[in-house]
Amino acid sequence: MRFITKTLILSFILISNSYADGISEKIGNLISEMVPGEGYTETSIDLRENNSPDFSILAVREIAKTDDGNFFTQFSLFNTEKNSSDRWVGNLGFGKRMLSDDKTSMTGINAFIDYDTKSNARASLGVEAKNAVLEFNANYYEELPNSFGNEVGEKVLDGYDLRLASQIPYLHWANAFVNSYHWDGVDRDDVEGIKLGTDMLLTSTMNLELAFDDKDKEGIEDEWYAKLQFFYPPREGATAQDGISDTKWKEEKDMTGQLLTKVKRQNKIMIEFKGNSKITRTD
């Protein structure tokens, strides 16, 4: 609970500061200069109870427009801790998104390749659907044949995850989500779990994800985590500074602005270590 209390206090300070918008906008402008081209760019800090912080940069860029949507690419680079050792992970993906005839909903498909500095390689296929209030994502992950992690005693695990998010009534700037995952163990039992949390848009360029990761696996601790994200361009709509709305749900809106948002997936590769009673973090 101390972790949650500290995170909430920090969030309150960030959004109550009279300079919050200016500070987050300056950070957003710096982020936009990190990766060339128009599109979505994000950098984040991932804070966890039982592990050192992770840092990442992610970008989404449009490849081509279509009559009903677009083709896009998403790529990211970040550090993470596995088996008490830091490593770097890169992701590269391509996808297609389609708008409904009235443009109030969006669906999409995507494919990714993930690679880390221990020569572990993985591919994934995903689908997504969203409107102004609800969002659904499903991803399947599988080790690539040319993954060399086995040579250093590591095994990439196949698996899947499902995520359903909904706007919180009267809080147009916050979503509640449930994210279930399953990883197929090789020399040990499978790993399953559920994340329960919330996404809160603190300012137009700053978001906080706060969740509890309930892991159904002995040897892997349940934990709270907080992910602070800075992004560019600024998002339209309500932020935490607007408080409680008079209306319960967001009105239906044109989803064209969502065509270059990031794909919700597990960018970190799930690893099983040989000769270790623990598997690893589940993200």
State where each predicted segment sits.
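Feature captures outer-membrane beta-barrel proteins of Gram-negative bacteria and organelles
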Residues: 29-31, 53-66, 88-102, 123-140, ...
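Transmembrane beta-strand segments that form the barrel wall of outer-membrane beta-barrel proteins
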Residues: 39-47, 69-81, 105-116, 125, ...
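Solvent-exposed loop/turn segments connecting transmembrane beta-strands
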Residues: 46-55, 78-90, 115-123, 154-156, ...
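Bacterial N-terminal signal peptides that target proteins for export
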Residues: 1-7, 60, 110
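Outer-membrane beta-barrel initiation region
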Residues: 19-87, 259-283
